[in-house]
């Protein structure tokens, strides 16, 4: 990918945080489902 290396590093840091948030969301949803909690 071409571009300013500082911008690319910053974007990589941001996407890392977004992926971590997604993983945490999925882990919690499975944990709640295992506990028998439902959305309804």
Swiss-Prot record:
Keyword Iron applies = yes
One Gene Ontology MF term? ferric iron binding
Highest taxon in the source lineage: Eukaryota
Whether Iron counts among this entry's keywords is: yes
UniProt-listed SUPFAM superfamilies: Ferritin-like (SSF47240)
Residues annotated as binding Fe cation are 18
Known InterPro entries for this protein?
A: Bacterioferritin (IPR002024), Ferritin-like (IPR012347), Ferritin-like_diiron (IPR009040), Ferritin-like_SF (IPR009078)
Ferritin-like diiron domain location: 1-40
GO terms under biological process: intracellular iron ion homeostasis; iron ion transport
The alphabetized UniProt keywords are:
Iron, Iron storage, Metal-binding
- Summarize the subunit comment: Oligomer consisting of two types of subunits: light chain and heavy chain.
Describe the function of this protein. May perform analogous functions in iron detoxification and storage to that of animal ferritins. Contains approximately 750 iron atoms per molecule.
Family, according to the entry, reads as follows: Belongs to the bacterioferritin family.
This protein's name? Bacterioferritin heavy chain
Q: Which organism is it from?
A: Absidia spinosa
Kindly list the organism's lineage.
Eukaryota, Fungi, Fungi incertae sedis, Mucoromycota, Mucoromycotina
